[in-house]
UniProtKB/Swiss-Prot annotation:
Keywords: Acetylcholine receptor inhibiting toxin, Disulfide bond, Ion channel impairing toxin, Neurotoxin, Postsynaptic neurotoxin, Secreted, Signal, Toxin. Disulfide bonds join C23-C44, C37-C61, C63-C74, C75-C80. GO terms for cellular component: extracellular region. The keyword Isomerase does not apply. This is Short neurotoxin OKI-10. Residues 1-20 form the signal peptide. It comes from Laticauda laticaudata (Blue-ringed sea krait). InterPro entries: Snake_3FTx, Snake_toxin-like_sf, Snake_toxin_con_site, Toxin_cobra-type. SUPFAM superfamilies: Snake toxin-like. It comes from the Eukaryota.
Amino acid sequence: KTLLLTLVVVTIVCLDLGYTRRCFNQQSSEPQTNKSCPPGENSCYRKQWRDHRGTIIERGCGCPTVKPGVKLRCCESEDCNN
């Protein structure tokens, strides 16, 4: 029983069950906010582009595909997309 319990604990620690990535999600110059990403989503992104309003910045979970002319930075650590 002790060996089985040890294996279960080691497995949980190694897999880090229940862990979710946290990313910033404020837009452009809004106050800084962040959110927990859905389970299995391990990336954060920061998209930046210019339009008639000026420079627009979008942040969130994942690493989306972007159109030409949009700068994209993806990263894989806590709150790395500011």
